[in-house]
Amino acid sequence: MAASWSPLVTLRSAARSRLTGRGVGCGARVVAIPPPAPGPGKPLWKAYTVQTSEGVRPTAASEARLKALAVCHGPLDHYDFLIKSQELREDEHQRRVVQCLQKLQEDLKGYSIEEGGLFSKLFSRNKPPKGLYVYGDVGTGKTMVMDMFYAYVETKRKKRVHFHGFMLDVHRRIHHLKQSLPKRKAGFMAKSYDPIAPIAEEISQETSLLCFDEFQVTDIADAMILKQLFENLFKNGVVVVATSNRPPEDLYKNGLQRANFVPFIAVLKEYCDTLQLDSGVDYRKRELAPAGKLYYLTSEADVEAVVDKLFDELAQKQNDLTSPRILKVQGRELRLNKACGSVADCTFEELCERPLGASDYLELSKNFDTVIIRNIPQFSLAKRTQARRFITLIDNFYDFKVRIICSASAPISSLFLHQHQDSESDQSRILMDDLGLSQDSAGLSMFTGEEEIFAFQRTISRLTEMQTEQYWIEGDRSRK
């Protein structure tokens, strides 16, 4: 199977063609070529690969970054080039991580998983190098260094996916595999069947290198299978590189039945070296020119009329009529009430009050370069589900450089309201009852929204960057 598509890899190839006068023509505008859509029967997780590979980094790049992709030969070379070009400033924490990624990139040259069974893999001379787990606060450059690594790594089969999307597909694969088993006859007990090993084998046949963005565990269904799944992947020879906001020891912290999850941490650390990237600087919040006012408070006078006017101005540049839009998402219909060309005008209720997920937001990101989001509420723990959807929405929009105009009930920095609860909510009690857990065994801090708060720090950082002129220009697909 061919390596997954990535814009940075595409830009690298196109940039070299641009400088040499081959391929796209000397001086030609470099454009990101869209990947083929996943066809019928292809695993869903390949769609998530497209999601993250397609939108992982800017769809527009500065001349210095294009030149770096054309002339550099590895992540460290690329990093040094951007320092000299004053595109980046020296950061010893970033450099240390890039140096480790450079070594791994060199170790992976020509690496592939041996064909055959587990026995042949165990005794293969082509031993896999250890992967890397890079963690640190939001905005410290984890995604950027992953971009550099992924653009230059030379292995036949590599994939870059959001961890959440990857696990969604694993569960779908498990479901499909179980559905394909012969039905048991009446009166006979069905034999227990463990689908994890064959699923891991299937994934191992598709890729030798798995790169994960946003490695975080919040779902008990994920937590219970991670050890077995990754143990099989590692034994099959899959190399893992991951970025996360948390050190391995803090994954699924205070989660339900965490004792069953803890062994996974040892497996992860056995096969991946752990690196901290935490310079104490959120580069997304650095001083950048604003793109004009893009974030409005609903308490401001005539805010609806102002946002209406902004939509009208954007719509006038589209060769289309304003009307409802229906998108097809995995056989379902996603209806939007108001859109014009590549501009959508949505309410928070449309996007986050309905049962939508990552695949829906992926489709939005592919179809629109500008989205208005009206009436975003201030999030409390009572709106936990909506907060999770909003986080996923912004993650997708950020990955695809989708430009946003917002009206909200609170400033970005105050959008998430952390509340201390003296007693567990009705929803928490119901969940505990369903799992047969007492208050003591459940660890009530699981229900304090700790994971959501952590993820929201990333969202606030991204929302801040999305207000800048640089981001707005990079997201203009009409320029490409």
Curated annotation (Swiss-Prot):
Tissue-level expression: Highly expressed in heart, kidney, and lactating breast. Present at reduced levels in virgin, pregnant, and involuting breast.
Keyword Mitochondrion appears in the UniProt entry: yes
InterPro entries, sorted: ATPase_AFG1-like (IPR005654), P-loop_NTPase (IPR027417)
Keyword Protease: no
Gene Ontology molecular functions: ATP binding; ATP hydrolysis activity
Keywords from the UniProt entry: ATP-binding, Hydrolase, Membrane, Mitochondrion, Nucleotide-binding
GO cellular component, one term: mitochondrion
SUPFAM superfamilies with a match to the protein in the record: P-loop containing nucleoside triphosphate hydrolases
Chief place of localization: mitochondrion
Cellular location(s): Mitochondrion membrane
Binding site for ATP: G136, D137, V138, G139, T140, G141, K142, T143, L209, L210, C211, F212, D213, E214
GO BP term (any one): mitochondrial protein quality control
EC number: 3.6.-.-
Domain of life where this protein originates: Eukaryota
UniProt function note: Putative mitochondrial ATPase. Plays a role in mitochondrial morphology and mitochondrial protein metabolism. Promotes degradation of excess nuclear-encoded complex IV subunits (COX4I1, COX5A and COX6A1) and normal activity of complexes III and IV of the respiratory chain. Mediates mitochondrial translocation of TP53 and its transcription-independent apoptosis in response to genotoxic stress.
Family, per entry: Belongs to the AFG1 ATPase family.
Record note on quaternary structure: Found in several complexes of 140-500 kDa. Interacts with YME1L1. Interacts with COX4I1. Interacts with COX5A. Interacts with TP53; mediates mitochondrial translocation of TP53 in response to genotoxic stress such as mitomycin C treatment.
Protein name per the record: AFG1-like ATPase
Source lineage: Eukaryota, Metazoa, Chordata, Craniata, Vertebrata
